[in-house]
Amino acid sequence: MSKVKTFGFDTLSLHAGQQPDPATGARATPIYQTASYVFKSPDHAASLFNVERAGHVYSRITNPTTAVLEERIAALEGGVGAIATASGQAACHLAIATLLGAGDHIVSSRAIYGGTHNLLDYTLPRFGIQTTFVDPRDPDAFAAAIQPNTKLLFGETLGNPGLDVLNIPAVSDVAHAHGLPLLIDSTFTTPYLCQPFSLGADLVFHSATKFLSGHGVIIGGLVVDSGAFDWAGSGKFPTLTEPYE
């Protein structure tokens, strides 16, 4: 019986998502400074634009360099895929805007980064999305705050800046009992210290500016999907499960 090869955290952090260049054998990931890509045929182009096969069509959407980052963080988190963004706040906003719309509701820990609090408390209400803030130490408070229009539960692994510890397994149980996903900001802990998917979270986002980069000279963010939440079965997220008309 053959054994499935698995790699440790250090190996994944160095090599996940990247292969040596097949033409030159170069080990390091290049920075692909391109906006467009070459297609083998009209049929090949059509299959890419119709998302029938993997590949790149335009760097605003995907890029080979960015794809390495996305695959690497997804591997470190134990997720099925990731999307890189221009900042951590962009990652948070992307996750929420994908799942929620006007008339929807979020239950959030109140011990969260100030920028995220402002997004939830001031910006999103302009678009018809309301948030109820609760004590992160009390999973029952999350359950009590859920409304018929609630679409998402949210918290941070460690609250910024007070380092409040969220009981992710208990809050995820609350979310799943109501058919809802749990989104976690894991910026403070990174996959090295905490992997929220193993504790029941469904989505994770990071500000890559902090501990992921480790040097404070870049701005970036990522959203990672665990692959465990049944988006179709929940019946609450048609933007993910139904075609655009």
Describe the role of every protein-language-model region.
Residues 2-63, 71-72:
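N-terminal "arm"/small-domain region of PLP-dependent enzymes with the aminotransferase-like
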Residues 2-3, 13-15, 19-22, 82-245:
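Conserved PLP-enzyme active-site core in the AAT-like
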Residues 41-93, 115-122:
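Conserved N-terminal alpha-helix of the aminotransferase class I/II PLP-enzyme fold
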